[in-house]
Amino acid sequence: MEKLVLIKVGGKIVEEEETLRQLLNDFAAIEGYKVLVHGGGRSATKLAAQLGIESKMVNGRRITDAETLKVVTMVYGGLVNKNIVAGLQALGVNALGLTGADMNLMRSDKRPVAEVDYGFVGDVKEVNADLLASLIHQGIVPVLAPLTHDKQGHMLNTNADTIAGEAAKALAKHFEVTLMFCFEKKGVLLDENDDESVIPEIDRIAFKGYVEQGIIQGGMIPKLENAYQAIDAGVKQVIITQASEIHQGKGTRVF
């Protein structure tokens, strides 16, 4: 089976000119089939403030009301996505920017109201893996924004880690997939204050122990839970690493 690397990047990596330039150079240097998934929450918060729209967060997750949905659609599907595509094209990478609405690539259901009403947020229900694989086999490099649709005419804000995980699981039917989650740290850390304390490998037993000890906490827990869901669905391996090391295989390998 042919190999494919799917990389998810977020935070300041895609929103600061110098870090984005370095990321795109490193991504362009990866040989073979590849997909890039990006976030953009900081840019969305900044634009919302400029427009006088309050950004509401609960447990680190954005509440997406009707006005906020307009902002994230503009920022994720427009500003951030097209800056990445333009940068990759300049490096000779035939990138194509997509949201889940394009060609019905990714359909979601609006998240039901529970303890918190997250608004226009989507939980992915269907990925058009055949279409995505067809684009990839044509030499196109998909750049996926964290937006889906409900096929009823509505866009939905969708977590970028979820987009990456669902795309990787769907593509595992067509490729041997390596899924990489990239952020500012070098990997999963034993000590959050020591950037060199990278845990090289984590299996399920170790993960459970680290959570119980409070070593792994916060946003890293759902990231690792997504990783194990991807592995269960056929993804070959998951790596959590720093964006500057995506072509070196460093970081934390999850298995």
From Swiss-Prot:
Its EC number is 2.7.2.8. CDD domains: AAK_NAGK-like. The gene is argB. Pathway: Amino-acid biosynthesis; L-arginine biosynthesis; N(2)-acetyl-L-ornithine from L-glutamate: step 2/4. Signal peptide: none annotated. It catalyses: N-acetyl-L-glutamate + ATP = N-acetyl-L-glutamyl 5-phosphate + ADP. This is Acetylglutamate kinase. Its main location: cytoplasm. GO terms for cellular component: cytoplasm. GO terms for biological process: arginine biosynthetic process via ornithine; L-arginine biosynthetic process. Transmembrane segments: none annotated. SUPFAM superfamilies: Carbamate kinase-like (SSF53633).
